Structures are given as C-alpha cells and as structure tokens.
Amino acid sequence: MFDFDDLSQAIARQTVLCVGDLMLDEFVYGEVSRISPEAPAPVIAVQRSEINIGGAGNVARNIAALGARCIFVGLVGDDAAAAQLEAELAREPGIETVLVRDASRPTTRKVRFVSEHFSAHMLRADWERAAPASGEIEQRLIDAIVPRLARADIVLLSDYAKGVLTARVLRNVIDAARRAGKRVIVDPKSANLAIYRGASVLTPNRKEFSEATRSRAETEQEIAAAAQDAIYLADCEAILVTQSERGMTLVPRQGDAIHVPAYPVKVRDVSGAGDTVVAVLAATLAAGAGWEEALRMASAAAAVAVSKQGTASVTSAELRRKILPHAYRAAEEKIIAGDGEILARVEGWRSEGLRVGFTNGCFDILHPGHVKVLTAARAACDRLVVGLNSDASVKRLKGESRPVQDERARAEVLAALEAVDLVAIFTEDTPLRLIELVRPSVLVKGGDYTREQVVGHEVVEAGGGEVILIDILKGHSTTALVDRARSDGR
C-alpha cells in the first residue's frame, strides 16, 4: 500500500497544463410516464436541470479538485454558451483559464435528458462544429499554450475531436514539451495514433484501442500484444487501455503489463469518468508516482466518478475514502485535537443516552497491562475517551529519554484498538482540564491508587459519576521494557 497522504501532498505542489475541447454539459432530469400523442416518443416531465463544465474543462476541474493547480487552454465560440463556460470556470478555484474565441463556430454544447427514476439517458442533443480549427485559430492556440509550458510540471491533452487538437497544434505542443523535458499525457480520439507521436502516455478506452490497433484484444495478454505496435507507432512510454467494469491495463514500452481491476460499484452515470481517470493519472505521475500507484489512484477515482450523477469531478477527500481501508480511516477519525471537536463528539454520544468513560496515560510502548486497563474501562461504559500525554508532558514526567514514540504514533496505536472511541492529547502534567471538559460518567485508572489519589475524581463524583480502579497486570511496564531494550543493546 502506497502512502496516500504523502502522494496527495505531492499532487498539491504540481501544476498541470491541460489543453483540449471544452464543452458545456447540461443535464435535464425528469420523469417519464406517458407517450406523446403527436408521435411515438416519450414525454419527459422536467423536474430540474444542471449546467456543468464538460469535455476537457471537466478534466481541468478534476485536476483542481485533487488539489493541484491547472492551467487550462480551450476554444469557444462567441455566444451565450461561451459566456456561461467562462463564468463557471472563473468560479473554479485552482484553474487558470485561457480561452481562444472563434466566432465562426458555436461553443460545443451537449444537453442530456435523463430519467430521474431510472438514472437512464433518454436523449442527447448536441450543438457543435467538429471541423478542425482554421490556420489562424491554430496559431492562436499554439501561442497560448507553448509559452505556458515552462510553468507546468506535466502536460495533458484531452482530445474529443472537436477541432482544438489538430495535427499542427499537437505537433507544436508535443515537440515543445519534449524539448522542455515535460511528459505529455494524451486522451486520444483519433484512431491514427501516429498524430500523437512523442507523447509519453496514451489513454484510449477499449473501443478506441480496438479501432486504432484493428484488433479485438480482450485479455490482458492480447492487449499487451496489440499495444506493442501502437507504442512503436506513437513513440510513447506506455499505453493505458481503460475498460470500464474490467478495469484498466497499462502496457509500458519496457517491462510487463500492469492490470488494475475496477472497484465493484453501482454505476449511476459514466459521463466524464474518462476525464477523471486521465486527470488523476497526470497529477499522480507529475507528483512522482510509479505506474502501479498512478493506476490504483485512477481506478479508485473512476469508481467515485461513476457513482455520481452528471459530469463529475472527484476530490482528494473522496479519493482518500475510496482507497484507504475503512479500519484505518475509522482509527484516524478517533484522534481529535481541538476542545470544540472533543466536546461535540462527547455531547453527541451523551444525547444518544450513551455512558461516556475516561482514562489516561502516556502509553509509550503499548503492552498487555495497558490493554487490560483499556478493555476494562471500555466494558464499564458505552464510549471510552483516552487522554494521552503530549511529548512534552511525558518528558517532564518520565525524563529526557522519553517518550520512545512521539505523540502521533502513540495516538495512532491507541486509536487502532476497538476498545478506544476517542483519543485526546493533553499538554498539561495531569488530565484535569480534559476531564473537566469531557465530564465523564466513569473515570477509570489502573495501578496502585486510592480513589482520592485519582486526578479528577472530584469532578466526576460531583456530576454523579463513579471512579473505577483496575488492578495492574504485574510484570508489564513501559519503563521495564525500555530498560531491557537498552541493556540488550549494550
């Protein structure tokens, strides 16, 4: 398992130059319950509609949603749809937009009519002119793209065959990127992969790959065999074939093919899922990820995207929830720092009629004695809060050589235990302030204490709570473990 948080932080430091066919996506949702008396066609009773940035613009949105910066260059007409797109893009944080206008063509617009009940697309209406851009517009696009290469860590070309990525534009951008040492990721539309020659990675879907290679490759082995000629033709590092529910297969120029299965999810809408895949792939590769890490990120992002309605983008937080094991995330969510958050969690439990318990300690090296106390404490309540001494607090109590593990490591170990429901780090020598905040119904302490010696007993008893003392498990102590380790190391 790769470190998602480290990779996510690296992604946030990247800038992706994204170029491609911009579209305005509109989704009209409604119910269908009858057939038109005028013609054998269903009648949709419209309930709502949504406007989204589509095409390469959705790729840019996905890049920004991951936390990376995006420089986006696209082509629009001189019409209302262009104004809508410009306004929508201006509202997107993390995207620097450069739009080239061509008054001779309409802004590409797609309207999809969707059955709300069945989440099924019934009809799509397109406004577009798919002809290649004129020579003048090509030059304006090149002039907008090439000077911005220096600010990018990677280049992403999203080709929907609507006229932006002509052979001339592709050649100028790819060649300039290679001279600048920048990798180029291409989501291709043309079956002639040679026009993308020199790109780093091509990402066709299964249909596009079959058309480009004139093959019916189905298995991983067949895809790998068919991809070799295509890799040579396009002079690229690798080809990634996306295969919907079958997952995705990457074939590198050198080395074995890598197949990553799809996540099992309920598919609500596939619109824009390919945009999500290529955006995540580019951002993760820019951040220094290897092939397999990038593919696993892209596969998880696709699963999130298809579970949403409409043209979807995927945030870093959503991706994190999909990739990290539930147990890891559940443990992580137990560690809370701020008083406000602690109080909100505790009050929430209390409002449900749950009995809140509290215990505390340094828990420097977790051992069976600790586990006994924690388990007994949890058995005495419905939710257990563990107060954990901070590093500075441990050092004052135990000496300069302690703690052995820092407070974050100690908190993570505690949070992984089923008996523990919340871990709160305190900086004082005693947990009295934390006990006053939590006001537990049960205060548990292990060791040779009397009730009067337990810090916070007055607070708990004044509120009608009880103090429970747990016998220590003899032969187990952190100090003894540390001393033994040091003597063995001499």
UniProtKB/Swiss-Prot annotation:
UniProt signal peptide: none
Cysteine-cysteine disulfides: none
InterPro entries membership: Bifunc_HldE, Carboh/pur_kinase_PfkB_CS, Cyt_trans-like, PfkB_dom, RfaE_dom_I, RfaE_dom_II, Ribokinase-like, Rossmann-like_a/b/a_fold
Catalytic activity field: D-glycero-beta-D-manno-heptose 7-phosphate + ATP = D-glycero-beta-D-manno-heptose 1,7-bisphosphate + ADP + H(+); D-glycero-beta-D-manno-heptose 1-phosphate + ATP + H(+) = ADP-D-glycero-beta-D-manno-heptose + diphosphate
Domain of life of the source: Bacteria
GO cellular component: cytosol
Active site: 275
Enzyme class: transferase
Keyword Transmembrane helix listed: no
Gene3D superfamilies: 3.40.1190.20, HUPs
Entry binding sites for ATP: 205-208
Keywords: ATP-binding, Carbohydrate metabolism, Kinase, Multifunctional enzyme, Nucleotide-binding, Nucleotidyltransferase, Transferase
Cytidylyltransferase, as annotated region: 358-490
Pathway connected to this protein: Nucleotide-sugar biosynthesis; ADP-L-glycero-beta-D-manno-heptose biosynthesis; ADP-L-glycero-beta-D-manno-heptose from D-glycero-beta-D-manno-heptose 7-phosphate: step 1/4; Nucleotide-sugar biosynthesis; ADP-L-glycero-beta-D-manno-heptose biosynthesis; ADP-L-glycero-beta-D-manno-heptose from D-glycero-beta-D-manno-heptose 7-phosphate: step 3/4
Region (Ribokinase): 1-330
EC number: 2.7.1.167, 2.7.7.70
Swiss-Prot/TrEMBL GO biological process terms: ADP-L-glycero-beta-D-manno-heptose biosynthetic process
GO MF: ATP binding; heptose 7-phosphate kinase activity; heptose-1-phosphate adenylyltransferase activity; phosphotransferase activity, alcohol group as acceptor
Family statement drawn from the similarity comment of this UniProt entry: In the N-terminal section; belongs to the carbohydrate kinase PfkB family. In the C-terminal section; belongs to the cytidylyltransferase family.
Self-association state and partner proteins as the record states: Homodimer.
Function statement: Catalyzes the ADP transfer from ATP to D-glycero-beta-D-manno-heptose 1-phosphate, yielding ADP-D-glycero-beta-D-manno-heptose.
Protein name: Bifunctional protein HldE
Annotated organism of origin: Bradyrhizobium sp. (strain BTAi1 / ATCC BAA-1182)
Higher taxonomy: Bacteria, Pseudomonadati, Pseudomonadota, Alphaproteobacteria, Hyphomicrobiales
